[in-house]
């Protein structure tokens, strides 16, 4: 059986955030964490921010239960922008209902 996944973030084809099939219990803390991290990175990197943002690798993650919602979450995150160029990562994530944390390859 295929595992359900959802998406949150920016896509060049859209004018605003994409939020698809992810619970607010994940999206709300994940969004806050990303915004705080991006603000800190912009401050620390100054003029180098944009180059660093767009050359960042795709990140794979496993989140323990309670970090961003009750369920453990597995996913990937990459740099992206919306239609007018506003920067914000795109995240694809899936809750692990059985409590497992699969190895990402």
Spans of features found by a protein language model:
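N-terminal ordered "arm"
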Residues: 2-58
């Amino acid at each position: 059986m295929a595992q359900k996944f959802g998406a949150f973030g920016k896509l060049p084809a859209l004018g605003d955030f994409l939020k698809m099939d992810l619970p607010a219990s994940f999206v709300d803390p994940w969004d806050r964490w990303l915004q705080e991290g991006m603000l800190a990175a912009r401050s620390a990197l100054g003029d180098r921010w944009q180059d660093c943002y767009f050359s960042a690798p795709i990140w794979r993650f496993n989140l323990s239960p309670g970090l961003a919602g009750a369920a453990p979450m597995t996913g990937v995150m990459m740099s992206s922008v919306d239609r007018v160029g506003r920067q914000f990562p795109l995240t694809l994530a899936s809750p692990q209902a059985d409590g497992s944390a699969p190895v990402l390859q």
